[in-house]
C-alpha cells in the first residue's frame, strides 16, 4: 500500500491495472522504514518479483488472447500469473481473450477435464462442494458486459471495433487460430490441442484481461 516504496523496490508491480491489499491500508512497509531510520539498509539484490493475478471471470479463460494490435502473443495454456506478466508487456498493457457462443460448453469441458488453461476453477459465491455452475458463470459474464469488461458482437468486424483493435488484423488472427484448432496442433505457441477451441459461431465475445 506504499506506492513510493513500490516504485523503489518493486517497480514491476506498478504495471498492474489495480492494487488491492486486505485489510486495506495495511502492508505499508512501516517496519522497513523504521529499520532504515535506525541505520539499516535494504538488501541489494534484484527487485521484488511481484505476484500479479488476473481478475477472475471472463478475462481468465484460456481462449485466444490478442493484444491491442489484434495479434496473438502467447500460449494461453499457462497459469494466471504468467498471463498477467505477458499481458503487461504488450503495447499499452492491453490484452483480450476472444471466444464465441460455445464458450459455456468450452469452459465447462476445461473445468471438468482438469485442463485449466489459466482459468479460475472456483466461482464467487459457489457453495462448498458444489461443482462449476454454468448459470453462475453466465450471470458473471452478464455483469462483466454491463461493467464494460466484456464486449459482445454478432460479427468479428463489429467485435474488433468495440475492442479498439485493427479489424483485418483480428480477423486474420482468428482465421489462423481456427486453422490450428482444425489441425489439432498449435504450430505457433504450443498450446495443448484440448484447449484449441475454434471461434466460429456468433455472437462473439472479448473479455479484457485485468491484472
Task: For every predicted segment, state its role.
Residues 41, 164-169:
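Helix N-cap / loop-to-helix initiation motif
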Residues 30, 158, 169-172:
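Extracytoplasmic/secreted proteins, especially bacterial periplasmic and envelope-associated proteins
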Residues 1-52:
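Glycine-rich loop(s) and the adjacent beta-strand/alpha-helix scaffold that form part
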Amino acid at each position: 500500500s506504499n506506492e513510493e516504496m513500490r516504485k523503489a523496490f518493486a517497480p514491476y508491480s506498478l504495471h498492474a491495472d489495480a492494487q488491492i491489499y486486505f485489510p486495506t491500508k495495511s502492508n505499508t512497509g512501516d517496519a522497513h522504514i523504521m529499520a532504515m531510520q535506525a541505520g539499516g539498509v535494504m538488501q541489494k539484490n534484484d527487485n521484488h518479483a511481484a505476484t500479479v493475478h488476473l481478475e477472475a471471470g471472463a478475462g481468465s479463460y484460456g481462449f485466444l488472447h490478442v493484444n491491442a494490435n489484434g495479434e496473438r502473443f502467447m500460449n494461453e495454456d499457462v497459469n494466471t500469473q504468467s498471463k498477467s506478466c505477458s499481458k503487461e508487456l504488450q503495447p499499452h498493457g492491453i490484452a483480450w481473450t476472444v471466444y464465441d457462443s460455445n464458450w459455456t460448453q468450452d469452459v465447462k469441458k476445461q473445468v471438468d477435464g482438469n485442463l485449466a488453461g489459466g482459468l479460475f476453477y472456483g466461482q464467487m459465491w459457489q457453495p462448498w462442494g458444489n461443482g462449476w455452475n454454468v448459470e453462475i458463470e453466465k450471470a458473471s459474464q452478464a455483469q462483466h458486459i454491463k461493467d464494460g469488461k466484456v464486449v459482445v458482437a454478432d460479427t468479428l468486424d463489429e467485435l474488433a471495433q468495440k475492442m479498439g483493435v485493427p479489424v483485418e488484423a483480428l480477423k486474420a488472427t482468428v482465421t489462423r487460430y481456427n486453422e490450428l484448432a482444425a489441425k489439432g496442433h498449435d504450430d505457433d505457441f504450443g498450446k495443448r490441442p484440448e484447449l484449441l477451441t475454434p471461434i466460429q459461431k456468433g455472437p462473439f465475445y472479448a473479455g479484457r484481461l485485468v491484472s
